[in-house]
């Protein structure tokens, strides 16, 4: 048998390619193959109430919560379900959740089995990143309508036990807390995320008093917002089945847990050497909840979304990475990129929604970006409303959209463990021409 040399094979391939028209090649550079980037719009948004850790949603899985948010968002959008081709849902703590959490949420929401689904894990930024990914499909002309959001049930995260081959032949066995292992632990430095917040507070000279005062403000704003019914349009009630029948959960559960007289007396949660400033009071809580948005092309928005309360144009998105220990200030890297891509300045932004992982996160980013006098988290944030990891990014976006007035710009930004952040600029609309 003759041996074919590489040179001979290459010569024949070149000759064959010469007879293959450029217009039929997969990677054609012809102008006819290029497509213009399209606009992506948000048609609706909804979120479940955010429940306390071991609270009302302890028996409801993350995908089931996600399904409630998806079903509500789709209903509000007016978009026929047959137009939706993809679902992107953030979910961080996937131990014992079951295969393909986003697929579960899509199916439980009643979407067609032909709808493709993808689960996104960018830690706290998962929900907002899911929206960015869905928007890209529309911008590239690959889809007409998408669903995106996030979901988490921190109450149901299991403890981990290594397989038998990794266990000692005798003696004690130690369980790992899945909540800490996969959600709250800095893998690179081997300490709690709260230590990162402590280092940020020290670096940017943010005192314990400043952090406590910000936390009190967050609770007071959330309480005022609920009193004034400002969350009514975004909430999707959750029906929870129990031994005594069904209970409908319609309100966030933690925002009333403020005792101003106790705030200053709380002990530091992470540094106990006398220098700690981060406490359970000025940090976000552990929670369960979900949020979802429906995105569409210009044609879809024009046909189905006129007058929708959450109608908005996605102007730009951005991600940025930083040293893992500095993750709290990663939004200060992502936001300028998003603003530059949007072609606007920070002074043109009407409302900012930053995730309140810790009070130190907000104070540091305000200081770096010069937002001390801006409208940042006017209705409270994760400290008072809760931080259900995979949902938080899309939750702040849903809340942002329901605050903006037509024509106004808003920015949602969220840091994530590992040293990164995602930011998004949106513009509120009342119609699409």
Curated annotation (Swiss-Prot):
<dbReference type="GO" id="GO:0006635">
    <property type="term" value="P:fatty acid beta-oxidation"/>
</dbReference>
<dbReference type="InterPro" id="IPR016039">
    <property type="entry name" value="Thiolase-like"/>
</dbReference>
<dbReference type="GO" id="GO:0003985">
    <property type="term" value="F:acetyl-CoA C-acetyltransferase activity"/>
</dbReference>
<feature type="active site" description="Proton acceptor">
    <location>
        <position position="387"/>
    </location>
</feature>
<dbReference type="GO" id="GO:0046872">
    <property type="term" value="F:metal ion binding"/>
</dbReference>
<comment type="similarity">
    <text>Belongs to the thiolase-like superfamily. Thiolase family.</text>
</comment>
<feature type="binding site">
    <location>
        <position position="416"/>
    </location>
    <ligand>
        <name>chloride</name>
    </ligand>
</feature>
<feature type="transit peptide" description="Mitochondrion">
    <location>
        <begin position="1"/>
        <end position="34"/>
    </location>
</feature>
<dbReference type="InterPro" id="IPR020615">
    <property type="entry name" value="Thiolase_acyl_enz_int_AS"/>
</dbReference>
<keyword id="KW-0012">Acyltransferase</keyword>
<dbReference type="InterPro" id="IPR020610">
    <property type="entry name" value="Thiolase_AS"/>
</dbReference>
<keyword id="KW-0630">Potassium</keyword>
<comment type="pathway">
    <text>Metabolic intermediate biosynthesis; (R)-mevalonate biosynthesis; (R)-mevalonate from acetyl-CoA: step 1/3.</text>
</comment>
<feature type="binding site">
    <location>
        <position position="284"/>
    </location>
    <ligand>
        <name>CoA</name>
    </ligand>
</feature>
<feature type="binding site">
    <location>
        <position position="229"/>
    </location>
    <ligand>
        <name>CoA</name>
    </ligand>
</feature>
<feature type="active site" description="Proton acceptor">
    <location>
        <position position="415"/>
    </location>
</feature>
<dbReference type="Pfam" id="PF02803">
    <property type="entry name" value="Thiolase_C"/>
</dbReference>
<keyword id="KW-0809">Transit peptide</keyword>
<protein>
    <recommendedName>
        <fullName>Acetyl-CoA acetyltransferase erg10A, mitochondrial</fullName>
        <ecNumber>2.3.1.9</ecNumber>
    </recommendedName>
</protein>
<dbReference type="InterPro" id="IPR002155">
    <property type="entry name" value="Thiolase"/>
</dbReference>
<dbReference type="GO" id="GO:0005739">
    <property type="term" value="C:mitochondrion"/>
</dbReference>
<dbReference type="Pfam" id="PF00108">
    <property type="entry name" value="Thiolase_N"/>
</dbReference>
<keyword id="KW-0808">Transferase</keyword>
<keyword id="KW-0496">Mitochondrion</keyword>
<keyword id="KW-0479">Metal-binding</keyword>
<comment type="subunit">
    <text>Homotetramer.</text>
</comment>
<feature type="binding site">
    <location>
        <position position="280"/>
    </location>
    <ligand>
        <name>K(+)</name>
    </ligand>
</feature>
<feature type="binding site">
    <location>
        <position position="219"/>
    </location>
    <ligand>
        <name>K(+)</name>
    </ligand>
</feature>
<comment type="function">
    <text>Mitochondrial acetyl-CoA acetyltransferase that catalyzes both the formation and degradation of acetoacetyl-CoA. Has no overlapping function with erg10B and seems not to be involved in ergosterol biosynthesis. Plays an important role in growth, morphogenesis and maintaining mitochondrial function including the response to oxidative stresses.</text>
</comment>
<dbReference type="InterPro" id="IPR020617">
    <property type="entry name" value="Thiolase_C"/>
</dbReference>
<feature type="active site" description="Acyl-thioester intermediate">
    <location>
        <position position="124"/>
    </location>
</feature>
<feature type="binding site">
    <location>
        <position position="262"/>
    </location>
    <ligand>
        <name>CoA</name>
    </ligand>
</feature>
<dbReference type="InterPro" id="IPR020616">
    <property type="entry name" value="Thiolase_N"/>
</dbReference>
């Amino acid at each position: 048998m003759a041996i074919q040399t590489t040179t001979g094979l290459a010569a024949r391939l070149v000759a064959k390619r010469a007879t293959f028209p450029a217009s039929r090649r997969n990677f054609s550079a012809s102008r006819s193959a290029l497509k213009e980037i399209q606009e992506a719009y948000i048609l609706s948004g909804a979120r479940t109430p955010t429940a306390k850790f071991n609270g009302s949603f302890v028996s409801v899985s993350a995908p089931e919560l996600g399904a409630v948010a998806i079903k509500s968002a789709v209903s509000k959008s007016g978009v026929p379900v047959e137009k939706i081709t993809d679902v992107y849902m953030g979910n961080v703590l996937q131990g014992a959740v079951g295969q393909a959490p986003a697929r579960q949420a899509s199916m439980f929401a009643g979407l067609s089995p032909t709808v493709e689904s993808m689960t996104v894990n960018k830690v706290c930024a998962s929900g907002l990143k899911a929206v960015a990914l869905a928007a890209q499909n529309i911008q590239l002309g690959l889809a007409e309508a998408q669903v995106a959001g996030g979901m988490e049930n921190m109450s149901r995260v299991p403890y981990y036990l290594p397989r038998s081959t990794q266990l000692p032949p005798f003696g004690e066995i130690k369980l790992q807390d899945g909540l800490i292992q996969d959600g709250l632990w800095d893998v690179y430095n081997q300490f709690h995320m709260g230590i990162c917040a402590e280092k940020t507070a020290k670096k940017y000279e943010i005192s314990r008093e400043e952090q406590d005062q910000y936390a009190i403000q967050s609770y007071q704003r959330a309480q005022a917002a609920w009193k004034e019914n400002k969350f009514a349009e975004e909430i999707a009630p959750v029906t929870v089945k129990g031994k005594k029948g069904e209970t409908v959960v319609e309100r966030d559960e933690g925002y009333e847990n403020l005792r101003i007289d106790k705030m200053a007396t709380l002990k530091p949660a992470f540094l106990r050497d006398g220098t700690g400033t981060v406490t359970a009071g000025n940090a976000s809580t552990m929670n369960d909840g979900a949020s979802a948005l429906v995105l569409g092309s210009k044609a879809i928005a024009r046909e189905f979304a006129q007058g929708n309360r959450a109608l908005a144009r996605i102007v730009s998105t951005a991600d940025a990475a930083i040293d893992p220990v500095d993750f709290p200030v990663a939004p200060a890297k992502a936001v300028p990129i998003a603003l530059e891509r949007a072609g606007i300045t920070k002074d043109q932004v009407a409302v900012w929604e930053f995730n309140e992982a810790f009070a130190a996160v907000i104070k540091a980013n305000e200081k770096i970006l010069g937002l001390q006098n801006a409208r940042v988290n006017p209705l409270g944030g994760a400290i008072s409303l809760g931080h259900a990891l995979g949902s938080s990014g899309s939750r702040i976006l849903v809340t942002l959209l329901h605050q903006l007035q037509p024509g106004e710009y808003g920015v949602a930004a969220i840091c994530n463990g590992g040293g990164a952040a995602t930011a998004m600029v949106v513009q509120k609309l009342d119609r699409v021409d």
